[in-house]
């Protein structure tokens, strides 16, 4: 028997088997020659689920979506050359959104590097600082020591991806020809296997009792507090944060991605309209918290970030399991390295019950006044983009997922996703906030989250049209709501809008595309709605039937800005009147 083929088969077989033993059971594969042995072994292993995606850029985001939804590592596999470079945007997003991806790139052997060989480039540390760890795997050798090495390296890399903060890792595999493994070999998956795996298990760190006692003592004298919950908070944060809020009397400013705004838990302490009322100058100048406790990433709301930045005299506690200093407002006074749950549990156990005071009632009152005013948009006959969110939430069933694209959809979700007793999971790519790969990420998530509705602008939709292929290949169920304002709607809210001479060509960027034929090409249904009743019917139909459904609602960018500002202005008047009335 060819010793090379035996070494290739057993060495890479040990690697693939170890992935499955470590619960990495999903891999997104893009076709290529140099990655052949790994791809074939993955397809052959009964413990591995393989998904084909021919476009590596889309494949990267597709894997990201699966990993976000499953909350566990997902592997990516491609051949050498620019194929690997196309993963870069998804790797960047995974790193900053703390999603564990196992990036596997095949490569030419060392003798074919830097000598002009085809499809060969430097793949060492290809993703730079956007992966937690890189390793160049050794060439396959036929020895028990090397089979064990393959498994131990796999364990190290998976541990790195899964320990806080989670993130992507990169393994580069140089492989010599011939590339076809021998599946007739006995015990193909058993080489190098030990009785136990060596992955580090991370639990919730125990809070030091001295710090907890000190903090409880301080908080007991701080009546004006805020609990701020951003994205990537722990899945059980709703239960623990609301219990902490009840103990302290501090309102919870819940980002939509915290998933605290919806569900069966008590939402008495939850504030959902802060993005609107924190624009009020009188409120910002007069409401001064003593302490802010923040979980998860920075919230979507710019108004909230600016409010936080002004609180230079407050105690500002950032809770982060990894201990990273995530404080773009530059006002944190303490960073506590602990899980959200460990932190909340420790305080809940020892905090005395602090009665709800005027501070909480002020936030609750202004929140309700703001919500009443914002709901006036439900009387608008025109296609107002904010109403897209409220009408989707209205028809989504219990347990559904709303995926919000970047740019305007996530901001409208922040402003118009009000508290609901239905459990509706909200997802988005808020690592580096790009508009690329949104369709692919949502489709990856839809493999686990069903039904899933994606809200996306026309430019973001165009940007990732290739991603629709996954819906066809893997028979996925998704409803995509395309808010088509023929351009980049968010720029109409920014100072660039005043530069009328060059605005449309540089920022508005209308592309004037009809997406109907593209959607049908990928086997989906397409509907362009006129009116809110038809909109709700189409979204509901899409969420309750199988397949790819695209619902397009056309809006006017200028009109949308006017309506947003009209709502904000009326809300500011209501808030100012209410605040002035309270001060008398």
Swiss-Prot record:
Coiled coil: none
Catalytic activity of the protein: isochorismate + 2-oxoglutarate + H(+) = 5-enolpyruvoyl-6-hydroxy-2-succinyl-cyclohex-3-ene-1-carboxylate + CO2
Record keywords: Magnesium, Manganese, Menaquinone biosynthesis, Metal-binding, Thiamine pyrophosphate, Transferase
Stated role: Catalyzes the thiamine diphosphate-dependent decarboxylation of 2-oxoglutarate and the subsequent addition of the resulting succinic semialdehyde-thiamine pyrophosphate anion to isochorismate to yield 2-succinyl-5-enolpyruvyl-6-hydroxy-3-cyclohexene-1-carboxylate (SEPHCHC).
Pfam families found in the cross-reference section: TPP_enzyme_C, TPP_enzyme_M_2, TPP_enzyme_N
Listed SUPFAM superfamilies: DHS-like NAD/FAD-binding domain (SSF52467), Thiamin diphosphate-binding fold (THDP-binding) (SSF52518)
The protein's name: 2-succinyl-5-enolpyruvyl-6-hydroxy-3-cyclohexene-1-carboxylate synthase
Keyword Metal-binding: yes
Pathway: Quinol/quinone metabolism; 1,4-dihydroxy-2-naphthoate biosynthesis; 1,4-dihydroxy-2-naphthoate from chorismate: step 2/7; Quinol/quinone metabolism; menaquinone biosynthesis
PANTHER family: 2-SUCCINYL-5-ENOLPYRUVYL-6-HYDROXY-3-CYCLOHEXENE-1-CARBOXYLATE SYNTHASE, PROTEIN PHYLLO, CHLOROPLASTIC
Subunit (UniProt): Homodimer.
InterPro entries named among the record's database cross-references: DHS-like_NAD/FAD-binding_dom (IPR029035), MenaQ_synth_MenD (IPR004433), MenD_middle (IPR032264), THDP-binding (IPR029061), Thiamin_PyroP_enz_TPP-bd_dom (IPR012001), TPP_enzyme_TPP-bd (IPR011766)
Gene Ontology biological process: menaquinone biosynthetic process
Cofactor comment text: Binds 1 thiamine pyrophosphate per subunit.
EC number: 2.2.1.9
Cofactor: Mg(2+); Mn(2+); thiamine diphosphate
Lineage: Bacteria, Bacillati, Bacillota, Bacilli, Bacillales
Gene3D superfamilies in the record: 3.40.50.970, TPP-binding domain
